Every structure is written in structure tokens, then in C-alpha cells.
């Protein structure tokens, strides 16, 4: 079932499976979101939780304090992208998705949690907020959360990919870990300079 929010500038279509966007169009009908092509990438905008990226052989080991270690299996980018969320409309331009841990999830991720994702249109922008709650006060809950949207680029004729860039809210300086695309693994100990007091990141196919 398609879930639609809109304002005078944008219309966004989403689905309950994975609480993910499936279309972003402007008032001129221009489609901004990648429409999924398995030749390149069949996804569109998955939500990543409780891990981002991959762990070796999909195997995670939990070592809680004063308790035996526990082993679970979590696929690349986590499991909520394959789960159906509940949802409710906040307004014509905003929708909220929620999901809670299930018995099935607890088999491999032994933490009771709730995840709430809200999409809100603000003029020509989409604000996305994430609220993760640990429902077990007696123990810490390790997790990561991320967004993985794909966009059509270029959007218009006579444009090229390199005409586009990402712009951050403020100037950023950071390093990134060594990556291994074939496995999706990262070497967190081997880091390389990436941004140096930059607010914009130019796009390229490297």
C-alpha cells in the first residue's frame, strides 16, 4: 500500500515495509529518488538498523557485563529494512513509522527496543527524524542507525554527474576507514583524511 505525504512543493511516496521512501517528485513532476534497477542497485532508500554496513560472516558477538557472551546473525545493514512498520499520519505533509523488537528479532539481537521514524515535508526539503529507545534500563544497547537513499543524477538534459555536490549544514573535518567493497567490511584502525574544513563534497565516480 502506497503512503503519500505532500505540500505545495513536493510529493513523497513511502511504504510500510522498511519505512522507506519510494518516490520524491516536485511540483513539475521531476523524480528525484532512484527507482531501483537490479543491474546496478535494486534498493531505493533503506533504513539501516541496528548495524550500518557488514560484519564478518554476518556474525555478531555480544559481551554483556557479568553475563556469558552471546552470538547472533545480522545481515548487512541490519534487519529492519525487511520488516513492516506501523504508521500514522501526523498531517498531510508528515507521517510517522514505528516498530518494536519482536521475538524473532531478539533471537539475534537480544535487546528490546523501539524505533520511530518521522518524515516531514518543509517547503522543498524532507526532514527525517529517528528516535531509538532502549526498553531495557538494566543494560546498555549497542546500535547504529543510518539512511541509504539513492538519487537520480543528473536530473536534467545537458547536465552531467559532476555538476552535483553534497552540502553539509556546517563545515566538517573528518577521516574515513579503509573500505573493502567486495565484503562491505571496514578497517576502523586504518583511516584516511576525507574532509578538511569543508561544507561541500563534490561528486565523482571514483
Model-predicted segments: where are they?
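Beta-strand-rich recognition/accessory modules
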Residues: 1-8, 101-102, 114, 199-206
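Beta-strand-rich N-terminal accessory domains
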Residues: 1-66
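Hydrophobic residues embedded in beta-strands of well-ordered beta-sheets
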Residues: 3, 22, 94-95, 126-128
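Acidic, contiguous internal or C-terminal segments within carbohydrate-active enzymes
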Residues: 5, 101-149
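Acidic/His-leaning functional-site neighborhoods
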Residues: 10, 74-88, 194-206
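Short, hydrophobic/aromatic beta-strand segments
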Residues: 23-25, 138-145, 177-179
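Active-site/ligand-binding surface loops and adjacent short beta/alpha elements
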Residues: 67, 140, 153-206
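Extended, loop-rich substrate-binding clefts of extracytoplasmic carbohydrate-active enzymes
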Residues: 70-123
Amino acid at each position: 500500500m502506497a503512503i503519500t505525504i505532500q505540500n505545495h512543493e513536493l510529493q513523497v511516496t513511502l511504504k510500510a515495509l522498511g519505512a522507506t521512501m519510494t518516490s520524491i517528485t516536485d511540483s513539475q513532476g521531476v523524480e528525484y529518488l532512484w527507482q531501483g534497477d537490479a543491474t546496478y542497485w535494486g534498493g531505493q532508500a533503506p533504513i539501516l538498523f541496528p548495524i550500518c554496513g557488514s560484519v564478518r560472516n554476518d556474525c555478531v558477538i555480544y559481551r554483556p557485563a557479568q553475563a556469558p557472551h552471546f552470538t547472533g546473525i545480522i545481515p548487512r545493514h541490519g534487519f529492519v529494512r525487511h520488516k513492516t512498520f506501523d504508521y500514522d499520519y501526523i498531517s498531510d505533509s508528515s507521517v510517522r513509522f514505528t516498530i518494536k523488537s519482536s521475538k524473532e528479532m531478539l533471537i539475534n539481537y537480544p535487546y528490546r527496543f523501539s524505533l520511530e521514524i518521522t518524515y516531514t515535508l518543509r517547503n522543498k526539503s524532507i526532514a527525517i527524524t529517528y528516535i531509538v529507545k532502549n526498553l531495557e534500563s538494566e543494560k546498555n544497547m549497542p546500535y547504529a542507525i543510518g539512511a541509504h537513499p539513492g538519487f537520480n543524477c543528473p536530473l536534467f538534459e545537458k547536465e552531467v554527474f559532476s555538476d552535483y555536490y553534497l552540502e553539509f549544514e556546517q563545515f566538517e573535518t573528518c577521516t574515513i576507514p579503509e573500505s573493502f567493497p567486495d565484503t562491505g567490511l571496514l578497517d576502523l584502525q586504518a583511516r584516511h583524511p576525507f574532509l578538511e574544513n569543508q561544507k561541500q563534497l563534490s561528486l565523482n565516480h571514483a
